[in-house]
Swiss-Prot record:
Protein's UniProt name: Guanine nucleotide-binding protein subunit beta
InterPro entries from the UniProt entry: G-protein_beta_WD-40_rep, Gprotein_B, Guanine_nucleotide-bd_bsu, WD40/YVTN_repeat-like_dom_sf, WD40_repeat_CS, WD40_repeat_dom_sf, WD40_rpt
Annotated function: Guanine nucleotide-binding proteins (G proteins) are involved as a modulator or transducer in various transmembrane signaling systems. The beta and gamma chains are required for the GTPase activity, for replacement of GDP by GTP, and for G protein-effector interaction.
UniProt keyword Repeat, yes or no: yes
């Protein structure tokens, strides 16, 4: 039995190497060569424009609304807060049944927010009730591991990723799981939906990223290259590429059409993992959130670092760029959110 397993293991390694070689052969140029004539970005200096105070404990997650004004944040204090980023006012403060929350999401319509975590449940809250109060409109149980990330497709469907090594698509109206996306061999830590919401990418503790089709539930592509857990993943604004952040202290850029990694963002001085990533609206800048409390700003084309967002007194746990590209928000264990531009 063990001999058979070893033979199969060797065979899979050989096949993986063949795929690697085939991909290499198809790569006719490198990102550095292709961008050699492009001007460098120059130093990026962002200032804190707003500080959102109201949480009483560590902030674990945040997500911008599609109006680029409101945002939602989730904290260990057991509250989900919807903020007006212009005025810094709290629009809603929603008490949660479980304070062990790891992710939150704002629906594209602005009608709903969602959250989940160690309770293994994705809870959906309606912000537009007739009575004016916010209430749980649906709880989606079904994952057998913690909920690591959730993102709305529309008002009636949401995609979740979980520590049970799967992702799922849910029908919010019925509360049923309509599709299960299986194939990762480690906890799925993060997901990102494409701009047209037809596909999503996931990053997992098996050090691979996968591209899934929302409509047929199939894994279309698998991307390897990282040497440790992938903690964060985000689509490039045009939907043809995505970036990942990993415990191997690198961010990487994968091109979907080239079917391979085309860029790596690392520095000898950076030895800690990355836990969230986000692109600027143009896609020229990549923001990475590191375990040493810092946020580095990378020039995507030149693969060089061009600035740091420093201003929190504790670990930065989450970051997000507005849809219109006008601002970046960071959330921290110091209980504050900061908005930069």
């Amino acid at each position: 039995m063990s001999n058979d397993l070893e033979a199969l293991r060797q065979e899979t390694e050989q096949l993986k190497n063949q795929i690697r070689e085939a991909r290499k052969a198809a790569g006719d140029t490198t990102l550095a060569q292709a961008c050699s004539g492009v001007e460098a970005v120059g130093r990026i200096q962002m200032r804190t424009r707003r500080t959102l105070r109201g949480h009483l404990a560590k902030i674990y997650a945040m997500h911008w609304a599609s109006d680029s004004r409101n945002l939602v944040s989730a904290s260990q204090d057991g509250k989900l807060i919807v903020w007006d980023g212009y005025t810094t006012n709290k629009v809603h403060a929603i008490p949660l049944r479980s304070s062990w929350v790891m992710t939150c999401a704002y629906a594209p319509s602005g009608n709903f927010v969602a959250c989940g975590g160690l309770d293994n449940i994705c809870s959906i809250y309606s912000l537009k009730t007739r009575e004016g109060n916010v209430r749980v409109s649906r709880e989606l149980p079904g994952h057998t591991g913690y909920l690591s990330c959730c993102r709305f497709i529309d008002d009636n469907s949401i995609v979740t990723s979980s520590g049970d090594m799967s992702c799922a698509l849910w029908d919010i109206e019925t509360g049923q799981q309509t599709t299960s996306f299986t194939g990762h061999t480690g906890d799925v830590m993060s997901l990102s939906t494409s701009p047209d919401f037809r596909t999503f990418v996931s990053g997992a503790c098996d050090a691979s990223a996968k591209l899934w089709d929302v409509r047929d539930g199939m894994c279309k592509q698998t991307f390897s290259g990282h040497e440790s857990d992938i903690n964060a993943i985000t689509y490039f604004p045009n939907g043809h590429a995505f970036a990942t952040g990993s415990d191997d202290a690198t961010c990487r850029l994968f091109d979907i059409r080239a079917d391979q990694e085309i860029g790596m963002y690392s520095h000898d001085n950076i030895i800690c993992g990355i836990t969230s990533v986000a692109f600027s609206k143009s896609g020229r800048l990549l923001l990475g959130r590191y375990d040493d409390f810092n946020c580095n700003v990378w020039d995507v084309l030149k693969q060089e670092t061009h600035g740091v967002l420093a201003g929190h007194d504790n670990r930065v746990s989450c970051l997000g760029v507005t849809e219109d590209g006008s601002a970046v928000a960071t959330g921290s264990w110091d209980s504050f959110l900061k908005i930069w531009n």
